[in-house]
Amino acid sequence: MTFAVGQRWMSESENNLGLGLIVAIDRRTVTILFPASEEQRIYALNSAPLTRVLFQIGDEIAHHEGWKGNVLDILENNGVAFYLLKRQDNGEEITIQERDIAHQMTFSKPQDRLFTTQIDRNEHFTLRYQALTHQQAQFQSPLRGLRGIRAGLIPHQLHIAREVGQRTAPRVLLADEVGLGKTIEAGMILQQQLFAEKVERVLIIVPETLQHQWLVEMLRRFNLHFALFDEERCADFEDPASALWINPFNTESQIICALDWLCEKPKRVEQLLEAGFDMLIVDEAHHLGWSEHNPSLEYQLVEQLARQIPAVLLLTATPEQLGQESHFARLSLLDPDRFYDYQAFVQEQQQYQPVAEAVQSLLADKPLSAVEKNHISDLLSEQDVEPLLKVLDSQAHDEQKALARQELIDNLIDRHGTSRVLFRNTRQGVKGFPHRTYNQITLELPKQYNNAANVLAMLGEKGDNDSFYPEQMFQKLNPDARWWEFDPRLEWLITFLKNHREEKVLVICRHANTAIQLEQALREKEAIRAAVFHEKLSIVERDRAAAYFAQQEDGAQLLLSSSIGSEGRNFQFASHLVLFNLPDDPDLLEQCIGRLDRIGQRRDIQIHVPCFADTAQVVLARWYHEGLNAFEETCPMGMTLFEAHQTQLNKFLQNPTALEGFAEFVSLTRKQQHELKQALEKGRDRLLELNSNGGEQAQQLATDIAEQDGTTELVNFTLNLFDIIGVDQEDLGEKSIVITLASNMLVPDFPGLKEEGATVTFDRQLSLAREDVEFISWDHPLIRHGIDLITSGDIGKSAVSLLINKALPAGTLLLEMIYVVEAQAPKGLQLTRFLPPTPIRLLLDQKGNNLAEQVSFSALQKQLKPIGKNMANKVVKMVRPNIEQLVKLSEQKIVAQAQQIIHNAQQLADQTLSAELNRLTALQAVNKNIRQDEVDALDNIRSQSLAQLQQATWRLDSLRVIVSNKE
């Protein structure tokens, strides 16, 4: 080694010190300063573990003043290198000494890292190559964005999510019946849009009572971290004494807020509009009241936002038959240019009703009547419909007729008036739901409650709803009163639990205090294991309670929950629901039952309602059951009837022992409920349901995703990733493991893994049963961030290995190189669909022959052995000229392969986007719901995509030096 003051060197044993500078030399030692780490080392001259840092023509150098330049020429004076650089910022040519090079200078090219002793372990190189190949596969997977949800694979949900999620700036109304998973559909659409980088900033507006439900659903099911915004949070950003003004909505990119709050605070709406968002999601959109001359404040607020925000999802469970005018208004929010005239909309909808009836005949395999054929011909062109009708009327084979029938239905769906903006599935259309059985338990009202009611009435403090929550009423007089010592509901519950020891039971109370006190009473009286679940707990604490309830062995027999606390949580593994307090409106009742009655529930649901005789509880329970049939069936018209009859109902509730005329009132309600139900059934749009359901394609989609759950490939890659990065793993059994950050991690941080760690599983069903267990798939943030951590960093970029092969002469050199072909383009173009970062593997021998096809990566890997770092450095120094020569040769050999990959990507993009554009353009001629801006956007995407693919490049990503030995 020849040392000179001012030279730059790297430490072979301490790469993390950065770029070193020789500051002193004496007869036996050399002193090197490492400014980046503020360290100094003294080495023996004849055995210093150092590598000289010299740059080549064309290399990029960072100057300590912050600018960068490319090397044009290299000079040397007294052993010190001088570089002629061309600055990247202004084009000026300037000569610098090597001491002026930035001390934090890093070496990212694999050959630079190799020659500066930054050599990785063999398994790191393997992990990098696997990460690149998996990244390519996942970018091109049609299932990306659909697999990672922690929910059952429900075909109709997957169909809607894929259909809408792949659009540019989707604007749709999701109107599935209650319990069919609109929130999940919206989440999956959002997830795909985020994965494709079509959206980044998202605003969710919901009723105040549903804020936490959405927060929990987005986090637990989709790993999306939303922030709740209210007046207190916004006020924190306003300091009258400060000149600095911050828009609070710019501080987060994914926000949930309450509709009521925004209506009260117009200033916040202005700030929302100023902040700007890419997607708006509005739940309970049927609350956006509208009439032609008097739109509600809520409607006008959402209308303002929807005009500015490109993508809009409106969620509602209210069918248009309960308010055609409001239904039109919701569609108008999505596309005001299309839905601008209410009367024209009504006439158009009437046109589709006969067609929907004709579809019923097609589905039932019945011959079409002349009238039905005419209705179909009115909607489809003659050239589309005539050949198909001829097949149906002919003596053709059943298979031919089935194909013709399906094509006819598909054509009708494409041309349906609202099929692109409206999706609705019904329970009747989806099937697979359990039965619900109502069990009323009538108990005698304790005298203590009666006395408390009389005292409060005398004091003028008795509330209208006290009779529904007698335990709360009793504690108004004495907050410490132990109501559970005399309340017969508790004794009934204890007996019920003893008789159903093997069953899981969900008990819902109106208030958190009731749930807390019930748990205490059950523990003290009978040592019954119960979990408590309410809004005063943090999300983590609720997770623990839910997990305790979900455990089959040693878990809680029952979960005691407040009605608000249970929002957003579903417990399909339980089939017994106890309503300790009867909800005081039909929507709340359905929300409580909906915790168990969800798609995916496999057993019939038993609903138990303990209530006191001669009280408002019994009166309301009877009206719910006999009038609305709300316990045993979903009742979409429940709130409509409740609001229509609220005055009359309240009279009976306030005087529950004077029920003259109540039977007639219940009978009237039942009659109206039946009429509304029939109207809804008659108005069912089977064509719309067919489009929303997805049919066999949706079933196949669910099957395809299920086949990818927990594959050996995924499990092996994940565990290997954890091992190498430095994530500790503890096997818990039951197909789950606990992962935590190790103290000696390879990287400073692992995005997606919390400090306290996580419990994870590759089993979808286990993750559904236990809310504290995360479901690992290719879409999970840990896997996506882990792959990105490897491929975007320096881990595994250079390695040296020993090849044990007796057939090769000892010392034979092979160079394994991984090139990556990629396109740098705006995120929204989604070019990774056509050209993800694509690895190309070369394996060159000393003569420059490419052996990659003859020797696979895995076959070679099995013959390799690790080599110590000191020996690896010596090998690299010995064969450096050979390596440099082979790298140059590889640059020629890679061209043809890379260009072919780019050409294939261009063809795929052209075919895919042209087909989408042609179909959309053709449909636009017959379906007014296809917006011109949607067509223009797709045309623009096609042009930009092809242009950007033309600019695709390739680079050397990583390399491995392989030297053979006999043993």
From Swiss-Prot:
GO molecular function: ATP binding; DNA binding; helicase activity; hydrolase activity, acting on acid anhydrides
Taxonomic superkingdom: Bacteria
InterPro entries: Helicase_ATP-bd, Helicase_C-like, Helicase_RapA, P-loop_NTPase, RapA_C, SNF2-like_sf, SNF2/RAD54-like_C, SNF2_N
Keywords: Activator, ATP-binding, DNA-binding, Helicase, Hydrolase, Nucleotide-binding, Transcription, Transcription regulation
E.C. number: 3.6.4.-
A Pfam family that the UniProt record links to this protein: RapA_C
Binding-site list for ATP: D176, E177, V178, G179, L180, G181, K182, T183
Helicase C-terminal domain span: 489-660
Class of this enzyme: hydrolase
Family annotation (SMART domains): DEXDc, HELICc
Motif (DEAH box): 283-286
Domain Helicase ATP-binding: 163-337
One of the GO BP terms on file: regulation of DNA-templated transcription
Subunit structure: Interacts with the RNAP. Has a higher affinity for the core RNAP than for the holoenzyme. Its ATPase activity is stimulated by binding to RNAP.
Protein family: Belongs to the SNF2/RAD54 helicase family. RapA subfamily.
Function: Transcription regulator that activates transcription by stimulating RNA polymerase (RNAP) recycling in case of stress conditions such as supercoiled DNA or high salt concentrations. Probably acts by releasing the RNAP, when it is trapped or immobilized on tightly supercoiled DNA. Does not activate transcription on linear DNA. Probably not involved in DNA repair.
Official protein name in the record: RNA polymerase-associated protein RapA
Species annotation: Pasteurella multocida (strain Pm70)
